[in-house]
């Protein structure tokens, strides 16, 4: 037995020296057996490297080399090697996920004994953290008794007592529970026992690339030193520390402490300690050697003479604008180097923390077509299998809530039979829309035997598009059947399960019978076929983790009474700590890692990115279950062979060593960079002290890594075709912004890209630089195909066209509609109001009555049954969905009663009576009403206008039927002459014309057009409050009346007249004392004025139809002054992307006109159409 140290700083070749010693031992005795131990994550690389070196020393002629006496292993694989046939190794393995599950169980069962951790069993984040802490304690050889001893040594009032006491209780239970399992600590302990009892006199053990050991690993190494023929430990250390450990500041602090511990232990065991050997220097560039000197002198606070700049060309510093362009520049430089003969494996990219770069790594390296391996653990908690299992529990907890069911289905692991994935996705989208629109939720609705029916909620009878109801009904019922036939079955089995084993078995069988396991296999096979090993293994590892958790659950709680909540929490805790094991997809790839992970020093060029002052040195993390102060309390009570890793501020002492190893992993060149912008926190970064000191000591001027721009040379940004396309777009955009010509070289880039397979994308992106948000015009032939040669339109559609032509095209040409949602909108309440008012007034008319004939009590009794009947119709489900909605329905009933009661009061003051409600003119859908309005168009075809008048009030005279059009509105409306002139308020004039054209005897003569506000008015209390009068005023009709003189309006409000004067409380009418109209109180049009308005209205309708069929779809929203409501209130903002600030988008800005101005224009030439902006470009 004996102990040999191989020392040397990071400029030396430790692996080469070790290989020479291995070769010598192999040749010395044919019985000698070699175990070469390295950290697990570099085992494969180390094995390849060692065998290459041994082959070189053996001078194998044909290049083939095999060796069966050399084993390159990690500690875990060494345990397998010696223990694989023992009972200990056959025990179930307690991996991180299973360990977390076990700790969750312990927390739940021991909460009555605990103080501060009693309520943490449901906190999966804490459970994961606690599980790691317990594992660390066991690996550190620390027992519950050690914790109790520490607690006993504390004063009664010490703030750490409760925490350490709880941890001691939990650790005591944990030690008992892990007995049947093989843990890392138990395997290392078992390995120690085996090694003590075996003849290792011909066994030579080499340990390389270790700088620190856990207590369990230290015990194993000490046993090796005591029992093996010889143990050789290689340490990155500039000198030995036999008598005392190194003292900070010292660059080699971690390795020096390990040397001292092993040296003293060997000395105590009276094991011979060989003379230290020093590794030979490895080939390094001059700059890298100079960098190594700087590390030692700067860390040890020694003065250093400034170096010549020429010596330092192999060390580069750079400052990037942000993390994305920092990493992109690195990728570009690697791409250029490989084009000149380098290999991808020559490069290593390191960061202290990769988090700021994790999201962009795949995209950047794919853009440059560079194979890469990111050595970073990825959590498994978002895998579709995990999401599916979580969703099953959530569905049971929340009674088939929309979010939970859709989350389950969107995993795409549960599929209907005989439905391909494209059809499933389409059906799922339809179902998603249906659920959002109808608010369907709950097990009862999902499992009902009656099929669902797809329909347009509150169907718009004005919509003439084809109804896809049958196809979509089939789709939503396919999804409904899938859920109803699968999910309830499992949930019932969980409800009836007696033991944990029954519940676990039912979940596994359900996954099997529903095809989830088959779908996972399909995913794996597809990934393999695509050559995506990482994706393939992710699916396999997720399934393996799940089955391991299920087995562990069955082992731990299989015979116990089944507790569903506990089952869920244990699975969640297990998955929360599970990660994917990754392997490189190719041997020749760029490795991306963190400086905290040991790597073999085989790269030629190392890039260290993210060198900010918060990452280098790293900000110490002291947020574990046991913080640094508590670890020190514990350490004071422990013997030397029991300890925990350092945490908190003390770890900063070893930070220089970690970064030193990373920097010195390169043999030829180091590039150190940092981004100025912290994109995660939207703040500015500062350079690392290492960066600043290195710049000063080596006289380096940092380069600037900025995005490619107009002045960037092509040589500097040479990259893959896809990367060059990105750079071209940026440079061309900069040229356009600065109004400068694009250089011929950049123009040549675009020309070259157009000769590659990227030509379509290059053409599209280049076109985006000159893009203006101008939809142009539709070809008239296409417009006719969209709308028909004879246009059948409603007034509201034409108003939309005059407000925004492009929105009309989106809404009625492309038939784009916003996604309907399950909510009570103004349109819903408006539809209900219209339906109730129509039915009640129709009932009265059929009975030969009017509102003036009934009492307020009659109204109050009639409305609630009507509301109840109408809300049972399809489309009104929301009003019965919740107690709150039921309350709102009752409020709507009271509001309708108030509205009708007030109408009753109004009709007692007027001679006009409702003749019809919901009076249709023209054809709407399959129904026809009164004759519609129809005019020929200048270039052929006709425009046919349809509509529905909410209420038509009529007063019969001997020679005429004077009528008033009444339109119900949920907000207050007035007749605006300017709006009518510009075409954004065509409704009232069109309705008046439609009725005036109806043949009748005596003829219909317009008396007015009025808006009625459906509202629930509020009144301020006062002593002189008269509710009847105030309600009349609140419900006052607004609009216009038609008359030559006061006699024409005598029947409108019988409480006033031209003779008596006064002001109406129900219509916009007032008289002066002399009998003339008081125009401050009235809105009166003469018959001649009305005729001019109607002629202009007709011209607007014909003009709009002509423009629509001509393909005019300008994006020029109507605007008065500075208002922007046409855009801000539009459902299509995200499509239009209208932004006047660009200088390309413009409003159709018009002046607001008064009645006098409007009358002046329409009486001069009623057919004159106001100017509308229309872009000249063609679509």
Curated annotation (Swiss-Prot):
Keyword DNA damage attributed: yes
Cofactor(s) this protein cannot do without: Mg(2+)
Pfam families, per the entry: ADDB_N, PDDEXK_1
EC numbers for this chain: 3.1.-.-
EC top class named in words: hydrolase
UniProt keyword terms in alphabetical order: ATP-binding, DNA damage, DNA repair, DNA-binding, Exonuclease, Helicase, Hydrolase, Nuclease, Nucleotide-binding
A GO biological-process term: double-strand break repair via homologous recombination
Highest taxon of the lineage: Bacteria
Record flagged with keyword DNA damage: yes
InterPro entries found in the cross-reference section: ADDB_N, DNA_helicase_suRexB, P-loop_NTPase, PDDEXK-like_dom_sf, PDDEXK_AddAB-type
GO molecular function: 5'-3' exonuclease activity; ATP binding; double-stranded DNA binding; helicase activity; hydrolase activity, acting on acid anhydrides
Alphabetized HAMAP family for the sequence: AddB_type2
Family, as annotated: Belongs to the helicase family. AddB/RexB type 2 subfamily.
Protein purpose: The heterodimer acts as both an ATP-dependent DNA helicase and an ATP-dependent, dual-direction single-stranded exonuclease. Recognizes the chi site generating a DNA molecule suitable for the initiation of homologous recombination. This subunit has 5' -> 3' nuclease activity but not helicase activity.
Additional comment: Despite having helicase-like domains, this subunit does not have helicase activity.
Subunit comment: Heterodimer of AddA and RexB.
Protein name: ATP-dependent helicase/deoxyribonuclease subunit B
Annotated organism of origin: Lacticaseibacillus casei (strain BL23)
């Amino acid at each position: 037995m004996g102990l040999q140290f191989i020392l040397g700083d990071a400029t030396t070749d430790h692996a080469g020296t070790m290989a020479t010693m291995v070769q010598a031992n192999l040749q010395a005795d044919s019985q000698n057996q070699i175990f070469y131990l390295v950290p697990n994550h570099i085992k494969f690389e180390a094995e390849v490297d060692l065998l290459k070196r041994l082959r070189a020393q053996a001078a194998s002629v044909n290049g083939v080399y095999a060796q069966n006496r050399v084993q390159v292993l990690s500690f875990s694989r060494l345990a397998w090697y010696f223990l694989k046939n023992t009972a200990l190794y056959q025990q179930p393995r307690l991996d991180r996920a299973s360990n977390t599950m076990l700790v969750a169980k312990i927390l739940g069962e021991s909460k009555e004994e605990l103080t501060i951790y009693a309520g943490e069993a449901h906190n999966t984040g804490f459970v994961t953290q606690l599980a790691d802490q317990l594992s660390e304690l066991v690996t550190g050889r620390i027992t519950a008794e050690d914790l109790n001893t520490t607690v006993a040594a504390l004063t009664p009032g010490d703030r750490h007592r409760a925490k350490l006491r709880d941890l001691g209780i939990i650790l005591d239970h944990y030690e008992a529970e892990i007995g049947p399992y093989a843990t890392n600590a138990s395997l290392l302990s078992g390995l120690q026992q085996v090694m003590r009892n075996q003849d290792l006199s011909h066994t030579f053990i080499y340990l390389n690339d270790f700088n620190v050991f856990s207590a369990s690993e230290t015990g194993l190494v000490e046993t090796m030193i005591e029992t093996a023929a010889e143990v050789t430990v290689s340490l990155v250390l500039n000198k030995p520390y036999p008598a005392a450990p190194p003292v900070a500041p010292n660059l080699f602090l971690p390795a020096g402490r390990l040397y001292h511990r092993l040296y003293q232990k060997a000395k105590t065991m009276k094991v011979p300690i060989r003379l230290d050997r020093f590794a030979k220097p490895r080939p390094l560039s001059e700059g890298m050697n100079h960098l190594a000197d700087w590390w030692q002198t700067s860390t040890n606070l020694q003065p250093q003479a400034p170096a010549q700049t020429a010596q330092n060309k192999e060390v580069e510093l750079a400052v990037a604008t942000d993390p994305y362009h920092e990493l992109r520049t690195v990728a570009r430089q690697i791409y250029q180097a490989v084009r000149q003969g380098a290999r991808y494996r020559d490069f290593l990219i390191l960061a202290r923390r990769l988090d700021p770069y994790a999201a962009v790594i795949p995209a950047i390296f794919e853009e440059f077509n560079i194979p890469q391996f990111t050595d970073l653990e990825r959590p498994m908690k978002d895998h579709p299998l995990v999401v599916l299992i979580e969703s099953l529990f959530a569905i049971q907890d929340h009674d088939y809530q929309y979010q939970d069911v859709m989350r389950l289905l969107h995993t795409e692991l549960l599929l209907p039979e005989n439905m391909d994935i494209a059809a499933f996705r389409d059906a799922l989208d339809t179902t998603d829309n249906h659920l959002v629109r109808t608010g369907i939720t709950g097990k009862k609705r999902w499992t009902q035997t009656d099929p669902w029916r797809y329909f347009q909620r509150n169907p718009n009878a004005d919509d003439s598009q084809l109804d896809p109801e049958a196809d979509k009904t089939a789709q939503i019922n396919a999804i409904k059947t899938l859920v109803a036939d699968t999910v309830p079955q499992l949930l019932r089995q969980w409800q009836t399960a007696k033991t944990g084993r029954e519940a676990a078995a039912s979940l596994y069988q359900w996954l099997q019978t529903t095809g989830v396991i088959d779908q996972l296999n399909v995913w794996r096979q597809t990934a393999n076929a695509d050559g995506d090993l990482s994706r393939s293994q992710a699916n396999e590892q997720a399934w393996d983790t799940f089955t391991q958790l299920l087995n562990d659950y069955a082992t731990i709680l299989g015979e116990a009474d089944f507790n569903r909540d506990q089952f869920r929490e244990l699975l969640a805790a297990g998955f929360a700590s599970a990660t994917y094991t990754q392997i490189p997809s190719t041997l020749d790839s760029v490795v991306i890692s963190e400086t905290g992970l040991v790597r073999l020093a085989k790269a030629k060029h190392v890039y260290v990115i993210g060198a900010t002052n918060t990452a280098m040195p790293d900000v110490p993390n002291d947020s574990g279950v046991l913080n640094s102060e508590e670890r020190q309390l514990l350490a004071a009570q422990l013997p030397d062979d029991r300890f925990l890793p350092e945490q908190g501020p003390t770890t900063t002492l070893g930070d220089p060593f970690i970064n030193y190893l990373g920097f010195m992993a390169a043999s030829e060149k180091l590039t150190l960079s940092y981004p100025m912008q912290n994109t995660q926190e939207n703040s500015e970064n500062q350079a690392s002290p290492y960066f600043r000191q290195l710049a000063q000591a080596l006289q380096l001027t940092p380069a600037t890594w900025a995005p490619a721009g107009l002045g960037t040379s092509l040589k500097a940004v040479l990259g893959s075709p896809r990367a060059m396309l990105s750079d071209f777009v940026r440079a061309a955009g900069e040229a356009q912004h600065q109004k400068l010509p694009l250089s011929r070289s950049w123009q040549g880039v675009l020309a070259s890209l157009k000769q590659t397979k990227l030509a379509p994308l290059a053409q599209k992106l280049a076109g985006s630089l000159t893009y203006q948000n101008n939809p142009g015009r539709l070809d008239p032939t296409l417009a006719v195909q969209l709308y028909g040669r004879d246009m059948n339109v409603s007034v509201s559609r034409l108003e939309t066209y005059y407000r925004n032509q492009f929105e009309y095209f989106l809404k009625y040409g492309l038939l784009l509609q916003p996604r309907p949602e399950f909510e009570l909108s103004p349109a819903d309440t408006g539809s209900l109001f219209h339906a109730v008012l129509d039915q009640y007034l129709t009932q009265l008319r059929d009975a030969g009555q009017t509102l003036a004939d009934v009492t307020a009590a009659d109204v109050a009794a009639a409305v609630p049954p009507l509301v109840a009947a109408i809300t049972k119709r399809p489309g009104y489900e929301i009003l019965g969905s919740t107690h709150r909605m039921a309350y709102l329905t009752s409020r709507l009933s009271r509001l309708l009663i108030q509205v009708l009661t007030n109408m009753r009061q109004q009709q007692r003051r007027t001679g006009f009576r409702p003749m019809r409600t919901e009076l249709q003119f023209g054809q709407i859908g399959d129904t026809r009403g009164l004759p519609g309005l129809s005019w020929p168009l200048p270039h052929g075809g006709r425009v046919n206008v349809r509509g529905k008048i909410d209420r038509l009030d009529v007063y019969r005279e001997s020679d005429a039927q004077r009528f008033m059009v009444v339109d119900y509105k949920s907000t207050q409306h007035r007749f605006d002459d300017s709006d009518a002139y510009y075409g954004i308020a065509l409704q009232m004039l069109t309705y008046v014309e439609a009725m005036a054209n109806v043949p009748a005897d005596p003829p219909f003569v317009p008396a007015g057009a009025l808006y009625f506000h459906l509202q629930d008015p509020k009144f301020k209390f006062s002593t002189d409050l008269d509710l009847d009068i105030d309600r009349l005023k609140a419900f006052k009709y607004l609009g216009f009346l038609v008359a030559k003189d006061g006699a024409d309006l005598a029947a409108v409000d019988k409480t006033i007249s031209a003779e008596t004067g006064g002001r109406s409380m129900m219509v916009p009418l007032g008289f002066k004392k002399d009998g003339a109209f008081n125009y401050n109180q009235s809105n009166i049009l003469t018959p001649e004025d009305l005729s001019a308005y109607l002629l202009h209205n007709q011209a607007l309708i014909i003009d709009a139809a002509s423009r629509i069929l001509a393909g005019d779809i300008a994006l020029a929203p109507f605007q008065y002054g500075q208002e922007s409501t046409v855009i801000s209130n539009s459902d299509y903002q995200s499509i239009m992307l209208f932004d006047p600030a660009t200088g390309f988008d413009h409003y159709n800005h018009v002046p607001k006109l008064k009645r006098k101005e409007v009358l002046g224009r329409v009486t001069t030439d009623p057919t004159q159409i106001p100017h509308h902006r229309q872009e000249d470009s063609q679509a």
